[in-house]
Amino acid sequence: MAEAENIAIVRRTYDEVFNRGNLDLVDAIFAPNFKNHTAPPGMQDGPGGVKALVTMLFAAFPDDRHDIEDIFASGDRVAARVRHHGTHARPFMGLPASGRHVSQEQMHIVRLEGGRWAEHWGVRDDLSFRQQMASPEQGG
């Protein structure tokens, strides 16, 4: 697949799955054996893990957004610099709802195979994200 097509697939995934919560597309966009090398603890691989992740994010951040700030491809891999942000309206990963708008920088590398996500690696500023959500008593 051409690099431009791979970029379009990743953009579509962020727009429709991660920003709109369209779980109906997950099985078509993610390979059955999809491997997320940086999944949250306890999250399964495959499309089921993606659905669980998106559901978890929208449960905690009803206005959850992932804005692609930079994206490029080389062969079967796409790299994207993403800003993840939303309002922490419900508990998330052990932290009670803060009502704060939180933001996190992320870097993602996706390997595509046959037009579908086959593997994912990500780097996130999880410490800063948790600090933004935490109350002063919790170190926020």
Where are the language model's segments positioned?
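C-terminal and inter-domain tail/linker signature
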Residues: 1-140
